[in-house]
Amino acid sequence: MKEKIALFGAGGKMGVRLAKNLLKSDYRVSHVEVSEVGKKRLKDELGLECVSTEAALDNVDVVILAVPDTIIGKIAAQIAPQLRPGTMVMTLDAAAPFAGHLPDRPDLTYFVAHPCHPLIFNDETDPEARRDYFGGGAAKQSITSALMQGPEEAFDLGEAVAKVIYAPILRSYRLTVDQMALLEPGLSETICATLLQVMREAMDETVRRGVPKEAARDFLLGHMNILGAVIFNEIPGAFSDACNKAIEFGKPRLMRDDWIKVFDREEIAESIRRIT
């Protein structure tokens, strides 16, 4: 008999995504949701009923916490006394585990699984897959996983569950929790999201200065495509001399000399503290 999974936050946006994919598996799933809105969403969209926490945790093998980072510690502390040794607690983000918000239970297995989301450069041909920017639906995406604590053989179970909830899968990478924290919030949010926000503000500024919005958007997104393909080695090539000169003078104008320190452990820890 396949393992029993308790999905907490099953009626949230992420929870419903996971519940939908779990329906395609052989896992035995119990759904837990406290809000009436979430219960209704789960019922309306997937025809699923929620159960009590006690029923969900009875002989459970894997507990998935599809809840906000800010309450993971609280929920984990509440359910920990009801979990038998060897139970896996899975979080969908490294923030709370990195911050030490999980209970001090050496006899539990802690597993973290986070999606990479569909790549900008991909080979999807189906229109639905090409429009699946988030992943877990039609487009393939890679995933990252970490076994924070627990027996080595537990990794296979955690990865197997992760491959189901985030399917379809392109590649699967095993990392440490610290490495996952470098990727998020470090690389994906502090760096990527911030610089994308700056690019959007820059585009808006060209519009304010008279460039038609559609022209500015096409120009920026098109250049992001080719420049990204070159700099991430998707295609052979090099930037023009003029472009390299613009980077040489533009980078110090835009970036502090010590920007790379956002990856220092203290900075990552402080960033996580702010969101948990």
UniProtKB/Swiss-Prot annotation:
Cofactor(s) required for function per UniProt: Zn(2+)
EC number: 1.1.1.421
Record flagged with keyword Metal-binding: yes
Pathways involved: Carbohydrate metabolism
Species of the source: Cupriavidus necator (strain ATCC 43291 / DSM 13513 / CCUG 52238 / LMG 8453 / N-1) (Ralstonia eutropha)
Pfam family, one: PGDH_C
GO MF annotation: an example: prephenate dehydrogenase (NAD+) activity
Keywords noted in UniProt: Carbohydrate metabolism, Metal-binding, NAD, Nucleotide-binding, Oxidoreductase, Plasmid, Zinc
Enzymatic class: oxidoreductase
Biological processes annotated in GO: tyrosine biosynthetic process
Residues the record lists as binding NAD(+): G12, K13, M14, E33, D69
Similarity comment text for this entry: Belongs to the ApnO family.
Binding-site list for Zn(2+): H114, E184
Role this protein plays: Involved in catabolism of D-apiose. Catalyzes the conversion of D-apionate to 3-oxo-isoapionate.
Protein name per its UniProtKB record: D-apionate oxidoisomerase
InterPro entries: NAD(P)-bd_dom_sf, P5C_Rdtase_cat_N, PGDH_C, Preph/Arog_dehydrog, Semialdehyde_DH-like_C
Gene3D superfamilies per the UniProt record, alphabetical: NAD(P)-binding Rossmann-like Domain (3.40.50.720), Semialdehyde dehydrogenase-like, C-terminal (1.10.3640.10)
Taxonomic lineage from the root: Bacteria, Pseudomonadati, Pseudomonadota, Betaproteobacteria, Burkholderiales
Catalyzed reactions per annotation: D-apionate + NAD(+) = 3-oxoisoapionate + NADH + H(+)
